[in-house]
Swiss-Prot record:
The lineage of its organism: Eukaryota, Viridiplantae, Streptophyta, Embryophyta, Tracheophyta. GO terms for cellular component: chloroplast. This is Putative uncharacterized protein ycf15. It comes from the Eukaryota. Belongs to the ycf15 family. It is found in: Plastid, Chloroplast. Keywords: Chloroplast, Plastid.
């Protein structure tokens, strides 16, 4: 499976519904803006003037990191189960994270 996001990190996501990436920031629709950074494998995403819909989540989480710098592990501040769905409706995983 092609990796959609090589690494992504965010915090302060109490009501995540849809996440958008724009100009190096991750923003949440509806209520809060989240601080964060990301790396994407395709340069056109980084140069895009429009927000890029990366995935939709069905469950809540407060913060986690995915990426090679964590050696494939998922680190989070609060335990949660997250179902990721790409914009094309492709489901790509359930993850249960342990609190640190």
């Amino acid at each position: 499976m092609e990796t959609l996001v090589s690494s992504i990190f965010w915090t302060l996501a109490p009501w995540n519904n849809m996440l958008l990436l724009k100009h190096g920031r991750i923003e949440i629709l509806e209520q809060n803006t989240m601080y964060g950074w990301y790396e994407l494998p395709k340069q056109e995403f980084l140069n895009s003037e429009q927000p890029v819909h990366i995935f939709t989540t069905k469950k809540r989480s407060t913060g986690f990191r995915i990426g090679p710098e964590s050696e494939g592990r998922l680190e989070c501040q609060q335990a949660s189960i997250i179902e990721f769905t790409r914009p094309d409706s492709t489901h790509f995983g359930n993850v249960q994270c342990q609190s640190h």
